A protein has these predicted regions:
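Sec-dependent bacterial lipoprotein signal peptides
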Residues: 1-21
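Bacterial Sec-dependent N-terminal signal peptides
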Residues: 15-45
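Mature extracytoplasmic or organellar-lumen-exposed domains after removal of signal/transit peptides
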Residues: 33-222
Length: 222
């Protein structure tokens, strides 16, 4: 599984930290520590951390971002979107944001290596370009969104005002379209992040598999 690759990286970092600590603390005694004897212990600890913290957090995030995508799709496909639909989108955004914020404690590995972190969470936004696209005639569906024009904060900007759901009457058809496609990119990034940690063999959900195939998401690993 791909997670073992991230485990090796984490183990290396922790080993270096242990070695530095040992050298600084034990300069004046003759006792030696066989660092290799610690490897199974450190490996077990890191495995537990990944299995009990990292992977469940990304599992939760993926499920909640799918919920967000579903709520956005309902609003996007409605001929006349309602305030209740927008409120549901805002509630789903808040739910999806929670596990992402928890994951900020372990943004090494795929989140950093493949620039998924800035794609999901860049701040500040490029509001000038966001508004320029909204006010243009460009096809939003064909856009390759820049990091500061996508992710959680861009979606937040589009659906909230002063911390509350916007009035649905203020959401134009172009904004609704932008909301849909920026959420779709957020979902792509989330599923890729999940798959990079779990490995391709763990992809069993049909919707995940179809998304990865249809959107040509590459699961790179290391």
């Amino acid at each position: 599984m791909k997670k073992k690759n991230w485990l090796v990286m984490s183990l290396f970092i922790s080993s270096m930290a242990f070695a530095v600590s040992s050298c600084s603390d034990d300069n004046n005694n003759d006792n030696t520590v066989d660092d290799s004897a610690m490897d199974p212990v450190k490996t077990a600890l890191i495995n537990d951390y990944i299995d009990l913290t990292v992977l469940p957090t990304y599992d939760d995030m993926k499920a909640k971002v799918w919920d967000l995508m579903d709520a956005v799709t309902v609003m996007f496909e409605s001929e006349t979107a309602t305030q209740d639909q927008l409120n549901a989108v805002c509630a789903a955004w808040r739910n999806a944001r929670e596990p992402w914020e928890l994951s900020e404690g372990f943004l090494y590995g795929p989140a950093a290596n493949y620039s998924i972190d800035p794609s999901l969470d860049s701040w500040p936004l490029d509001q000038v370009n966001i508004e320029a696209l909204l006010n243009s005639s460009q096809n939003i569906a064909e856009q390759t969104f820049a990091q500061d024009n996508s992710g959680f904060h861009t979606l937040e900007y589009l659906i909230f005002l002063n911390g509350n759901p916007r009035d649905i009457s203020s959401i134009s058809s172009r904004q609704k379209e932008y909301i849909y496609y920026v959420t779709k990119k957020l979902l792509d990034d989330t599923v890729r992040l999940w798959a990079e940690w779990h490995g391709e063999k763990a992809i069993s959900d049909q919707r995940d598999a179809e998304l990865i195939e249809n959107d040509e998401i590459t699961i790179a690993g290391v």
